[in-house]
């Protein structure tokens, strides 16, 4: 399929960085892009193992369905045949495969992974446990892509995003606000507020962690305080980087 410029940029970032975390607006085609990237990885490399984890099995299955659809629509000379094809997995003749599982039990415990995908990560309750379990499966050089719309602050997705922005966890952060889509305008955004409400539109369109959560205080007021009073430290010290300095002392 033909890519928009922002999708081309995201694809290049996938290739450049081992770990990517995406805070995205809805309906930007990013799940489809990840599916196409997964198929490329499987098709042109032997014995690659892609695992998709989502809140529900049906959600994870959608990505396998997209990979299957893309493969079926390839020109004949690009197809290499399949050795396994069902609703939750697709294995190519070269040994590469993609599987879909729900976020339950031993979801992250698998054979060595080439690519781990978390879909709608902000809504997976036990994702921290799954991520810890997956570390050993990624230790042989696997990559990870985490994508989601925001779901308030303080959850695992929000923490990973904040740490990624500060450069402390190895994740490259990719923010995809609704305005990156060339065919959307303010009229479209206003329509989303009418359909979804202020909170729903903040979550689904604006990549807004504060506005998407269950806040007692008006999210717009919280955002004003954040933009007005909160600033990044000028320096971080200590072996773990947890001594934050906003202003150096004046000894004069």
Task: Report the location of each language-model feature.
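Phosphate/NTP-binding elements of NTP-utilizing enzymes
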Residues: 1-252
């Amino acid at each position: 399929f033909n890519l928009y410029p922002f999708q081309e940029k995201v694809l290049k970032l996938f290739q450049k960085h081992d770990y990517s975390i995406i805070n995205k607006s809805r309906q930007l085609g990013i799940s489809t892009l990840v599916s196409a990237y997964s198929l490329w990885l499987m098709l042109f490399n032997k014995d690659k193992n892609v695992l998709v984890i989502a809140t529900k099995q049906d959600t994870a299955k959608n990505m396998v369905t997209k990979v299957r659809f893309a493969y079926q629509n390839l020109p004949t000379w690009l197809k290499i045949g399949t050795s396994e094809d069902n609703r939750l997995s697709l294995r190519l003749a070269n040994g590469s495969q993609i599987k879909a599982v729900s976020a339950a039990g031993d979801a992250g415990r698998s054979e060595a992974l080439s690519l781990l995908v978390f879909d709608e990560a902000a809504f997976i309750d036990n994702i921290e446990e799954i991520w810890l379990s997956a570390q050993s499966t990624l230790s042989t050089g696997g990559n990870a892509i985490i994508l989601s719309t925001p779901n308030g602050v303080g959850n695992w997705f929000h923490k990973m995003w904040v740490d990624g922005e500060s450069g402390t966890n190895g994740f490259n952060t990719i923010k995809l606000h609704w305005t990156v889509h060339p065919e959307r305008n303010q009229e479209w955004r206003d329509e989303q507020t009418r359909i979804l409400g202020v909170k729903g539109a903040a979550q689904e369109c604006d990549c807004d962690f504060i506005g998407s959560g269950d806040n007692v205080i008006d999210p717009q007021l919280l955002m004003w305080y954040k933009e007005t009073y909160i600033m990044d430290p000028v320096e971080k010290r200590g072996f773990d980087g947890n001594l934050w300095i906003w202003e150096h002392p004046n000894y004069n």
